[in-house]
């Protein structure tokens, strides 16, 4: 048994002043540690696709329906199971539909309430009463506790429960009670949620996803490359703000900025209409992946805005590269290699014709210098990001719940990669005069990302940290990017595909190697034999035979594939992961239709479950990180108990 400072024991004695209270708490802790481990749910790369995200979150990647089958599989047919599942996912909307179609609504309420109570009892059985009580809505907490923690099939209790339910129905509270039960079931089937990066990107509703996550009961977040871009913009990085707007313009998603966050793009529109009024901006036409009905005039204006912000972005990136020699990115100083008279560019020793040679704001003698109008414009845009309350609220949440990586219950979670050389050794990067690699590098990236947000505007520390945030978006040794270079300029201006190549970091080949994965796990102080790496960022091309399970199960790639643009490439809507007391299960998902279809026709995302690892002995809370903390608390309390019994401390009755 460990030794402990008497000063600490005296402090502990204030909370547990008697032998009885100390012993009771030890018993409570031991009981909690013997409960089954809660279910962890892993999602990644949501990319603003709110409808599909909401469905997966509400159905727990199929856990809700599986629990229904466990309880009612012999009693209900598939149609009834689908109906009950949909009710739990979307209780209010589904009840509106049922109310308009059901003749004997009283009987439906009664049957449904009994089923939901029985299901809720089942999913609550692995938790303490205290935890279940905290999850209950206040309005129904007492009644729910009565119904959930007794056996209402016993004769002496049956009438009691019948009366409770009868009064709920007769008082017109059945729908509210059904909603409360449904949401409680949703919450109890998943104990903890991991978002392994990229809520943001081209999808239309990252703001709604963030609102949902902010109301979720228990979660953590590993930042993705697109998240870091928005975090940089919210921190006051001009280049990050320019990148965010460019991507939004490219994918016809400016509504997220103007409508969802209230960031006015009128200054950009006025600037673009003036500077590029005679420019067709042919190669900046936005991609209309959703076939949204825009007028020709609107498309023309967005194309001009797209080009205007892109040129500003390239200039700002050049400024950073020139002042940060340690980034080793001089090969990305492209504007100086353009022959503005001939309309050509020198890339890696070869001359290429530019697709577009209209650069009214570029001074060939000083190509990275912003014009006065550009400087004023990007200043207004950056201020709009910094002053947007809703965005700041979302970004603060990302900082409070997020990190560059996470070790959790023996597993390692990160979005992009661990930068490696071809021989499998960790790549080094110099930051503030010191070299870092592996875990230490990611820790420094996280420190600097946080500094970018909190350091005072105008300080050199703020400027450096914001530059690092941009590097994380685009740099060769960034753990979030994972490629040699980002060839954005070439994709706009050069036709030859050879110039568009972005070579992946050796990590992406080496992660198939079990020894490399064990090496990475051990670098993060995890057991290389038992642990797993949970990785997002790269869509798994199942149609081409790629597997999300790599390195004999050590590496699990769960790019959620929510972005519709990747569905043709992946043959799927991606993967999620479940880790419960029985083991690890990878869930592959087919594309989601719509919320309306799910409610009306009771369609669900078709999901296929694959067991990766089955526990011989069911995992208990004591086998988790929380269990380790509880065990330590119990040991401390045992020492306190000994101190009372040996007369070292006196009880305060």
Curated annotation (Swiss-Prot):
Keywords annotated in UniProt: Carbohydrate metabolism, Hydrolase, Manganese
Pathway of action: Carbohydrate biosynthesis; gluconeogenesis
Keyword Ligase: no
Species of origin: Listeria monocytogenes serovar 1/2a (strain ATCC BAA-679 / EGD-e)
Disulfide partners: none
Gene3D superfamilies on file: 3.60.21.10
Gene of this entry: fbp
GO BP term, example: gluconeogenesis
Official protein name in the record: Fructose-1,6-bisphosphatase class 3
Taxonomic placement: Bacteria, Bacillati, Bacillota, Bacilli, Bacillales
GO MF annotations in UniProt: fructose 1,6-bisphosphate 1-phosphatase activity
Known catalytic reactions: beta-D-fructose 1,6-bisphosphate + H2O = beta-D-fructose 6-phosphate + phosphate
Cofactors, names only: Mn(2+)
InterPro entries: FBPtase_class3 (IPR009164), Metallo-depent_PP-like (IPR029052)
Similarity section: Belongs to the FBPase class 3 family.
UniProt keyword annotation of Nucleotide-binding present: no
EC number: 3.1.3.11
């Amino acid at each position: 048994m460990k030794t402990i400072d008497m000063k600490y024991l005296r402090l502990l004695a204030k909370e547990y002043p008697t032998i009885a209270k100390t012993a009771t708490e030890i018993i409570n802790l031991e009981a909690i540690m013997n409960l089954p481990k809660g279910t962890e749910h892993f999602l990644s790369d949501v990319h603003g696709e709110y409808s599909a995200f909401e469905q997966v979150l509400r159905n727990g990647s199929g856990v809700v329906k599986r629990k229904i089958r466990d309880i009612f599989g012999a009693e209900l047919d598939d149609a009834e199971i689908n109906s009950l599942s949909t009710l739990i996912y979307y209780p209010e909307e589904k009840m509106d539909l049922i109310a308009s179609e059901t003749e004997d609504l009283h009987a439906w309420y009664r049957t449904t309430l009994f089923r939901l109570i029985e299901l809720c009892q089942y999913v609550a059985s692995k938790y303490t009463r205290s935890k279940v009580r905290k999850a209950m809505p206040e309005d129904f907490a007492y009644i729910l506790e009565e119904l959930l923690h007794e056996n209402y099939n016993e004769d002496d209790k049956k009438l009691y429960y019948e009366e409770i339910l009868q009064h709920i129905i007769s008082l017109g509270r059945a729908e509210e009670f059904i909603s409360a039960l449904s949401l409680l079931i949703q919450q109890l089937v998943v104990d903890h949620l991991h978002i392994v990066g990229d809520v943001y990107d081209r999808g239309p509703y990252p703001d709604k996803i963030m609102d949902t996550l902010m109301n979720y009961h228990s979660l953590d977040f590993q930042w993705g490359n697109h998240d870091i871009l928005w975090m940089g913009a919210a921190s006051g990085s001009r280049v990050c703000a320019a990148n965010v707007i460019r991507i939004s313009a490219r994918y016809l998603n400016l509504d997220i900025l103007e409508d969802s966050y209230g960031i006015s793009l009128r200054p950009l529109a006025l600037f673009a209409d003036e500077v590029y009024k005679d420019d067709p901006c042919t190669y900046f036409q936005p991609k209309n992946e959703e076939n949204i009905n825009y007028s020709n005039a609107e498309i023309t204006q967005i194309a001009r805005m797209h080009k205007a912000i892109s040129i500003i972005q390239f200039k700002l990136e050049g400024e950073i590269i020139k002042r940060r020699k340690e980034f080793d990115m001089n090969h990305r100083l492209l504007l100086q290699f353009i022959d503005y008279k001939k309309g050509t560019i020198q890339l890696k020793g070869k001359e290429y014709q530019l697709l577009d040679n209209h650069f009214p704001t570029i001074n060939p003698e000083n190509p990275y210098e912003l014009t006065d109008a550009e400087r004023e414009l990007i200043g207004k845009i950056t201020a709009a990001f910094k002053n947007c309350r809703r965005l700041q609220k979302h970004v603060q949440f990302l900082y409070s719940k997020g990190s560059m990586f996470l070790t959790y219950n023996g597993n390692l979670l990160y979005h992009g990669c661990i930068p490696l050389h071809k021989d499998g050794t960790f790549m080094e990067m110099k930051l503030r005069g010191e070299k870092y690699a592996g875990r230490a590098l990611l820790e420094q990236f996280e420190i600097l990302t946080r500094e970018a947000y909190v350091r005072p505007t105008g300080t050199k520390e703020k400027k450096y940290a914001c530059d690092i945030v941009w590097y994380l978006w685009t740099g060769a040794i960034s753990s979030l990017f994972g490629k040699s270079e980002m060839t954005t300029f070439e994709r706009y201006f050069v036709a030859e595909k050879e110039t568009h190549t972005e070579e992946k970091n050796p990590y992406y080949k080496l992660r198939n190697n079990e020894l490399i994965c064990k090496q990475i796990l051990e670098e993060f102080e995890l057991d290389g034999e038992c642990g797993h790496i949970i990785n997002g960022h790269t869509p798994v091309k199942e149609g081409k035979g790629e597997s999300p399970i790599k390195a004999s199960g050590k590496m699990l790639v769960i790019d959620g594939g929510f972005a519709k643009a990747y569905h043709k490439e992946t043959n799927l809507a991606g993967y999620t992961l479940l880790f419960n007391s029985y083991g690890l299960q990878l869930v592959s998902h087919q594309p989601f239709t719509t919320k309306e279809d799910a409610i009306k026709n009771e369609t669900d995302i078709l999901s296929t479950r694959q067991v990766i690892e089955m526990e011989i002995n069911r995992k208990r809370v004591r086998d988790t990180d929380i269990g380790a903390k509880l065990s330590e608390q119990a040991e401390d309390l045992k020492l306190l108990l000994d101190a009372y019994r040996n007369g070292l401390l006196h009880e305060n009755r």
